[in-house]
Each structure stands twice: as C-alpha cells, then as structure tokens.
Amino acid sequence: MTGGANGIGRCITEYFASEGDTVYILDKEAKQTVLVVNEMQHKGWNVIGCFGDIADKQTLLDFAGQVLSEHPEGIHCIINNACLMQGGVLDSCEYEDFLYVQRVGVAAPFMLAKLFKDHFVGLGSIVNISSTRAFQSQPNTESYTAAKGGITALTHALAVSLSGIARVNSIAPGWIETGTHQEAAFAPSNESDYLQHPSQRVGNSDDIARAVVFLCDERNSFINGENITIDGGMSKLMIYHNDCGWEYKAR
C-alpha cells in the first residue's frame, strides 16, 4: 500500500487489516506513518510501516526486499494510492516538478508491478487509484492530471501483460472528502456542493475502500483491466450555460 498513512490510503489499510490481512504501508511521511501503524497495531492488526519517497527507485527496491524477506511465500495484492499535485502550466510547476509527479504517480506503480510480478500467491490483484481528472480537467492541474491519465492507461497495459499472474484494475474517485485527499479544489462549504451531484452528496474514503476490497476479492476475478469511476454520477452530468440552473462565469 503506497500512501497508506492518510486519507483514502489509510482507510483502505484499515479495511484490509481489520479483516486479518498483513498490510505493508509505504509512505513518505514517517511521523504520520508511525502514528497510524501504532494505532492499528494497538487494535491487534498486523500493519508494518515503511518510509521513503517512491519517486526514488532505491526506495522501491528496499521496500520489495523487506516485504519478500519477511514473507518469502509472496503477496496477494498491491494498492497504488500515492500521488500529489504540483500545479501546472499557469504557475511555478517546472519541468522537474512535472516529472517528479509522474515518477510518483506512474513510474512507481510500474516498478512495483515489475518487482512483485513473480511473487504473487495464486492470481494476484493490483488496484491503482486514478481520478476523474484522468478524463476531465480544471485549469492548472497538468502535473496531477497527466499522472492520473498515465496510471489509467498503465492499468489496462499491465492487465494484458500480467495475464495469469495478476488482475489489474483502477478506481477513479471524484469529489472525496477526507482530511488530506480531495479531488475538488476546495472542501464542500454549502448545500449546493453536495446537491450538484446526482447522488446528492460528496464521496468519502469508505466509498473507495469498499471498491478496492471488492476488486481484490478473488470471487470477482473476471473483472480485469477496468477503470471504475466513483463520483456520485458527476462526470455523467451534462453541463451547459443557463441549462438546468447552471451558469458560466468567465475567469
């Protein structure tokens, strides 16, 4: 589990750990990871915290080495959750900033699949956390949007390459309200933020975690290479100026 110390990643970790699974968290925030791991271990859950920047290849090599040395029998699932925003073409996002986001959001998931592909127990499962930003955009989000488009395409590519080894699927969250992970640019502040969604609410981490557990369940092994959008129907809503109460305001 990458990015397992906060937000959606933490929630996913809790779902698996509470069912008795051993979960390895790889997160850049060492202090938060220690806090989360201690809380979960206090509940009797088997959660192990690992620290490092997944943009660094050596971090991934060390992580895989630790997991496999402690569990030589192999693993069952990989959850690629970690990513970050570094802005886009309208602000101070530079070439190196853009590439850094791609290393975290696309290159690291590729490398983890490569490192673990020979070590799955039975038919494994890889779930990549994408975003509705892979398919629609707001201004100045190029670094993050490109990474989420990349992880979505990587999903179906890996599904084909890892046939018989692991199923690979992705989830594209919409507006998810957590302490640290929001696809929207701001927290919901009024009733309209909720009611604009066909589901008339914003999402929460549990909505995503339940879908991840579903995709990792071997009973659902015919689902492969797919992206599941979880956004309360928002991306299906046709929006035009002065239509159904929508109004365009020029920037």
Summary of predicted features, one role per range:
Residues 131:
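Residue(s) in the substrate-gating loop at a strand-loop-helix junction
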Residues 89-90, 94-99, 193:
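Substrate-binding pocket helix/loop in short-chain dehydrogenase/reductase
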Residues 136, 213, 224-251:
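Short C-terminal tail/terminal secondary-structure segment
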Residues 1-24:
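Canonical Rossmann dinucleotide-binding motif of NAD(H)/NADP(H)-dependent dehydrogenases/reductases
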Residues 118, 159-164, 221:
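Alpha-helical segment proximal to the catalytic Tyr-Lys
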